[in-house]
């Protein structure tokens, strides 16, 4: 959805149509909630009631908040995080890897990582803006939107701003399929970047 939204905004959209789509989406929210699986409903309830430990998924978020909070400004040091090393924090190598960064490298480490991601997204947007053809620009914007969604979703759920999902943090989370997909999409960006200038033979 985020990829489609990014491409549509870049290609241009009638805001009257956009307004109607948003209104229909808001009206349809109750129906969407009733149609999703029970575990997904519990994740939404857990997000709305983070203090309720009886809701599955809240334990993960609580341990994530403890890990980030205990890291302080500079962190406990690499491989010295108690929540991580003693396995209090579930799925710490993929979904909640940002909490590990917060615990072991502190606020400074988290800010540095977010800064790197921000520059990464900025460079991709520059490539999209400088593309010589509309197709290449839309491809670059679509890939940028995908990376932006993954980054915001993963960090957001780690700090209790967004309901928990299984979205990984690009290039940081453990997982072959995640890294392979990210590298393939980055390849698309590099291909668009290569074609910004005319090649002379």
Functional labels for PLM-detected ranges:
Residues 108-123:
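Selective detector of the "anchor" transmembrane alpha-helix that sits immediately C-terminal
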Residues 14-19, 127-135, 200:
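Interfacial helix-loop-helix linkers and transmembrane-helix boundary segments
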Residues 17-110, 134-135:
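Hydrophobic, glycine- and aromatic-enriched re-entrant/interface helices and adjoining loop segments
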Residues 1-9, 24-26, 185-187:
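Hydrophobic transmembrane alpha-helices of multi-pass, membrane-embedded glycosylation machinery
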Residues 22, 100-103, 143-147, 175-178:
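Transmembrane helix-bundle signature of multi-pass membrane transporters/permeases
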Residues 5-14, 119-128, 190-196:
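Structural signal for the C-terminal ends of transmembrane alpha-helices
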Residues 153-201:
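A juxtamembrane structural motif centered on a specific transmembrane helix
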């Amino acid at each position: 959805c985020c990829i489609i939204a990014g491409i549509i905004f870049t290609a241009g959209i009638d805001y009257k149509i956009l307004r109607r789509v948003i209104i229909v989406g808001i009206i349809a929210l109750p129906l969407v909630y009733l149609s999703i699986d029970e575990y997904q409903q519990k994740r939404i309830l857990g997000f709305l009631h983070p203090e309720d430990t009886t809701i599955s998924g809240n334990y993960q978020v609580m341990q994530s908040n403890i890990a980030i909070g205990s890291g302080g400004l500079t962190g406990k040091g690499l491989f010295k995080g108690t929540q991580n090393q003693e396995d209090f924090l579930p799925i710490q190598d993929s979904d909640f890897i940002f909490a590990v960064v917060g615990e072991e490298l502190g606020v400074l480490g988290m800010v540095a990582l977010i800064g790197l991601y921000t520059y990464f997204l900025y460079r991709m947007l520059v490539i999209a803006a400088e593309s010589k053809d509309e197709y290449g620009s839309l491809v670059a914007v679509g890939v940028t939107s995908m990376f932006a969604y993954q980054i915001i979703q993963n960090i957001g759920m780690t700090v209790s701003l967004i309901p928990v999902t299984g979205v990984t943090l690009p290039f940081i989370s453990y997982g072959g399929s995640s890294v392979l997909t990210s590298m393939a999409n980055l390849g698309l960006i590099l291909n668009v970047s290569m074609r910004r200038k005319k090649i002379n033979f």
